[in-house]
């Protein structure tokens, strides 16, 4: 079994990362998941949160607002709705993201109100996880 797996993180705007990783921690809608080389194949929906990648260069953190991840034993591919490096996630950017999530939650149809409220709570937690 290999010691690393290919990790790619892309958003509609750009490619944020492409590295050989030994571990990728993903904020899943159904719960967080750590993928390592040899992991069983899975596709998961992402919630707003911190995605952590461990590679030979060290540990890198990325903020994602949602999206999808495809995991296999050889690679992890993340398609993020919006992705930022940890350095790019400033208090001002987080406040903008929170305002947008609140606007969506306030305007949500009753059939999706719970999901919108959960997204808002996850967005608030994102800031507290990184001390914003």
UniProtKB/Swiss-Prot annotation:
* Cellular component annotations (GO), alphabetically ordered: plasma membrane; plasma membrane-derived chromatophore membrane; proton-transporting ATP synthase complex
Q: Which UniProt keywords apply?
A: ATP synthesis, CF(1), Hydrogen ion transport, Ion transport, Membrane, Transport
Show which residues constitute the signal peptide: none
Is Protein transport given among the entry's keywords?
A: no
Q: How would you describe this protein's topology in the membrane?
A: Peripheral membrane protein
What would be an example GO MF term here? ATP binding
Q: Tell where it localizes.
A: Cellular chromatophore membrane
- Asked if the record carries the keyword Cytoplasm, the reply is no
What Pfam families does its record include? Answer: ATP-synt_DE_N (PF02823)
Hey, which family's this protein in? Answer: Belongs to the ATPase epsilon chain family.
Record's function text: Produces ATP from ADP in the presence of a proton gradient across the membrane.
Subunit comment? F-type ATPases have 2 components, CF(1) - the catalytic core - and CF(0) - the membrane proton channel. CF(1) has five subunits: alpha(3), beta(3), gamma(1), delta(1), epsilon(1). CF(0) has four main subunits: a, b, b' and c.
What's the protein here called? ATP synthase epsilon chain
- From which organism does this entry originate? Rhodobacter capsulatus
* Biological classification of the source: Bacteria, Pseudomonadati, Pseudomonadota, Alphaproteobacteria, Rhodobacterales
């Amino acid at each position: 079994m290999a010691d690393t797996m290919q990790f790619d993180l892309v958003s509609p705007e750009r490619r944020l990362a492409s590295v050989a990783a030994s571990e990728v921690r993903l904020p899943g809608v159904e719960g967080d998941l750590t993928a390592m080389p040899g992991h069983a194949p899975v596709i998961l929906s992402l919630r707003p949160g911190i995605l952590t990648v461990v590679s030979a260069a060290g540990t890198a953190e990325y903020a994602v607002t949602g999206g999808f991840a495809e995991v296999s034993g050889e690679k992890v591919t993340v398609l993020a709705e919006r992705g930022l490096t940890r350095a790019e996630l400033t208090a001002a950017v987080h406040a903008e993201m929170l305002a947008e999530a609140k606007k969506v939650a306030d305007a949500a149809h009753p059939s999706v109100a719970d999901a919108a409220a959960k997204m808002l709570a996850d967005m608030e937690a994102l800031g507290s996880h990184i001390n914003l």
